[in-house]
Regions:
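Surface-exposed binding/hinge segments that line
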Residues: 189-258, 653
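A structural "hinge/loop" feature
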Residues: 92-116, 136, 219-229, 377, ...
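Short, well-ordered beta-to-alpha junction loops that form the rim of enzyme active sites
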Residues: 213, 417, 643-647
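Extracytoplasmic/periplasmic ligand-capture domains
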Residues: 4-5, 16, 20-55, 67, ...
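Short, charged/polar, Gly/Pro-enriched secondary-structure boundary elements
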Residues: 215-221, 300, 534-535, 649
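Hydrophobic helical h-region of N-terminal Sec-dependent signal peptides
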Residues: 9-14
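N-terminal lobe/hinge region of extracytoplasmic solute-binding protein
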Residues: 61, 67-71, 75-144, 175
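Edge beta-strand plus adjacent loop/short-helix module at the start
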Residues: 118-122, 162, 252-270
Length: 691
């Protein structure tokens, strides 16, 4: 009966996916992004034309703001927006003002909400990473070797309280927080080049100058990463100096610590702080609710010159899980659901489709852009020396991959969508766009993709993981008991759980003992940082639009991915910790770190990455990053995927205008990696309620 039900569900979902325009099972790597290296003009992210001239008598602002102007409590629009505002072209039509966007969100720290607000980023990814356009900055220029950049701000831009926004707000972050040894903010890696921190100055109120010791060709790409404005979802970059001075010991002698400062600087929990967002926070109930209202000084307009956003308010209620969020969508309570709906399993698609007739709910499927789907990665710097040796055996890792039934994953969990894969970076990455890249992508994708238990068994035998005591369970080469423990963040979703169970089933079928270990989120972070996990699971690789903007998956540059101790070793290179604590054991160092032995792939990956990140020539840099892929092909897999670039669900009521379809997006969507700032990258401020 269960088998019959599964195939019935597959049939229903297949029809729903077709109705939503699901991507083909095999999608070719994206075309090469347009070059974005020329100095940028002060142009809009989507619009090529300036706003239309205001018609006589038109207000071009929300009625609630116009009433305040008439009452004399708010300056007129021309005094509230910059002379050269950001112009956002609506996807379909000029919208209408009014309404409240009700959100029911599982991210109680405001992470998902931050992803809907892209307005702190000076540079914006557009067209799913195919191009970059100005955002908070109106433009930029740079010298030939990309060692010096100027970032130009929009004159007349204001914080949400009406105070001027200038280069001093960046310099406050940089000088009084980042370069302040008493504060926890540190220089982000993209402001370090040639082993030296950039020299940053502000020659005037609207110019910021960056000078690097070596070429820094990724600088603009990195400014476009994340929504910014809060950590850890990017960098703060701009902090309202006029407001935050009161909490800073340098400016207020009554303050001696940064405790109150750090509490007050985050807009997600402090509704008093001025912001540069489309909506400004007005009330906050910790872990329960956050209410925001339109920012009267927001610096963006539509192509008719109407100040954005169209929607008056954002009312966020925090809920426990995606199931609770789903119920609010089906009740018609949530007008638009991006995150967390993208985390809904595809089995829910038919449920959402059924709500079309009852509440006028629309659904679409945006590509995740993921290179692995749900995946696992063995700990390359495992604390157990026996497991460390086994996990570094390529035969063993390939055997784990051959023992995964990807056909089953694709059919049952992803309903025939996506692309089976051994695990790569995003198929939408620029590295896979030319003929060399397409060939590399295919080799990497197909490295150990077949479901072949005979091959898996033979490779496990070759790796020495044999049944030493005749109990039917494979042991370590020493004869000691072997248990593979897949460590998962306890706050996971049904898709992660379902795929991980199929992985467990496959591994057990070749004689491996497997446990799935759900761990508290905070503890999972500690285990990752200290290299205490066994095999990390319930996660996915999807970063883009190129390897170098977030290299952690393919190059071990931090402690938060495959080789924590080696990543931490690399991370302190060039800092005052380099070369210190060598008399201590790796786990006793702060942070815990270890130098790789000669011949370890870490050295080759670091060599290629260090060369690529300072290579100003685009073609040469592309060739270097493709060599990084070649290391993964020749010595991997280091992470093991299942089904890549699967579709994700978004929903919205038919009363909502200007929500793009996947066909209107540059690459059909790119919802997986947070560095792409979905859904801020499709500008919710131009979405509206039809009246």
């Amino acid at each position: 009966m269960r088998r019959k039900w599964i195939f019935l569900l597959i049939a229903v979902l297949a029809m729903a996916l077709v109705a939503c325009g699901a991507p083909a099972a095999e999608e070719a790597p994206a075309a090469a992004p347009a070059a974005a290296e020329a100095p940028a003009a002060a142009e809009a992210p989507a619009a090529a034309e300036a706003p239309a001239a205001a018609a006589e008598g038109a207000t071009h602002e929300a009625p609630m703001l116009h009433e305040m102007v008439l009452a004399g409590t708010l300056p007129p629009l021309e005094e509230r927006i910059p002379a050269e505002p950001l112009v956002i072209e609506p996807y379909n039509e000029i919208g209408q003002y009014g309404g409240t966007w009700h959100r029911f969100d599982t991210s109680k720290d405001g992470g998902h909400l931050s992803m809907a607000m892209y307005s702190y980023s000076p540079v914006h990814w557009v067209q799913d990473g195919l191009d970059k356009k100005p955002g908070l900055a109106k433009g930029w220029d740079f010298n030939d070797d990309k060692t010096e950049y100027n970032l130009y701000l929009r004159e007349g831009t204001r914080w949400s309280d009406g105070e001027p926004f200038t280069s001093a707000d960046f310099m406050f972050w940089w000088e009084d927080m980042v370069l302040n040894p008493d504060h926890s903010d540190v220089p982000p890696d993209y402001l370090i080049s040639g082993g030296e921190v950039a020299t940053i100055t502000a020659p005037d109120d609207y110019t910021i100058n960056f000078k690097f010791a070596a070429s820094s060709p990724l600088f603009l790409d990195r400014l476009a990463m994340w929504p910014n404005g809060v950590t850890p979802a990017g960098e703060r970059l701009f902090v309202p100096k006029h407001y935050m001075e009161q909490f800073h010991p340098k400016y207020n002698s009554a303050v001696t610590t940064y405790e109150e400062f750090d509490k007050s600087v985050d807009w997600r929990s402090n509704p008093e702080i001025p912001v540069m967002l489309p909506w400004m926070p007005v009330s906050y109930e910790p872990g329960t609710r956050l209410v925001m209202e339109r920012n009267p000084y927001y610096y963006a307009v539509d192509t008719a010159g109407n100040q954005l956003p169209y929607i008056d308010r954002v009312d966020v209620t925090f809920v426990e899980n995606v199931e609770a969020a789903k119920l609010r969508v089906l009740a018609g309570d949530q007008e638009m659901c991006f995150r967390p709906c993208v985390y809904q399993p595809l089995s829910e698609l038919s449920v959402f489709r059924d709500a079309e007739a009852t509440i006028g709910l629309k659904t679409d499927l945006f590509d995740s852009g993921g290179g692995t789907g749900v995946m696992v990665y063995p700990n390359w710097t495992h604390q157990d020396p026996q497991k460390r040796e086994l996990y570094r055996n390529q035969d063993f890792r390939k055997a784990l991959s051959y023992a995964i039934d990807r056909d089953k994953v694709q059919k049952i969990v992803y309903f025939g969508t996506g692309e089976k894969t051994t695990g790569t970076m995003s198929p939408k990455g620029i590295e896979f766009s030319d003929e060399v890249g397409k060939d590399l992508y295919a080799q990497w994708r197909d490295l150990a993709i077949e479901f072949d238990l005979d091959k898996a068994n033979a490779m496990l035998d070759a790796a020495g993981a044999v049944d030493a005591n005749g109990d039917g369970i494979r042991d370590l080469p020493s004869g000691d008991e072997l248990t593979l423990r897949i460590d998962c963040d306890g706050i996971t979703n049904r898709t992660n759980a379902a795929v991980t169970e199929i992985i467990q089933e496959g591994w057990e079928s070749v004689g491996l003992k497997v446990q799935i270990n759900a761990v508290d989120s905070a503890q999972m972070g500690v285990m990752q940082d200290n290299s205490e996990f066994d095999i990390r699971g319930c996660w996915g690789v999807g970063d883009g639009p190129n390897f170098l903007v977030f290299p952690n998956w393919v190059v071990w540059v931090d402690n938060n991915r495959t080789a924590p101790l080696y990543g931490a070793w690399y991370k302190v290179i060039g800092t005052d910790k380099e070369g210190t604590e060598l008399d201590k054991a790796p786990l006793e160092r702060n942070p815990p770190r270890e130098e790789p032995p000669a011949g370890d792939p870490a050295w080759k990956l670091w060599e290629l990455y260090d060369a690529a990140r300072i290579e100003p020539d685009d073609a040469k840099r592309l060739a270097l990053t493709q060599e990084i892929a070649r290391v993964h092909i020749e010595q991997g897999p280091f992470f093991i995927g299942t089904v890549a670039n699967t579709p994700t669900i978004i929903t919205y009521l038919d009363s909502v205008g200007n929500v793009p379809t996947r066909d209107q997006l540059g690459q059909g969507g790119f919802t997986g990696p947070w560095i792409m700032s979905y859904f801020g990258a499709i500008y919710p401020e131009q979405m509206y309620y039809k009246q």
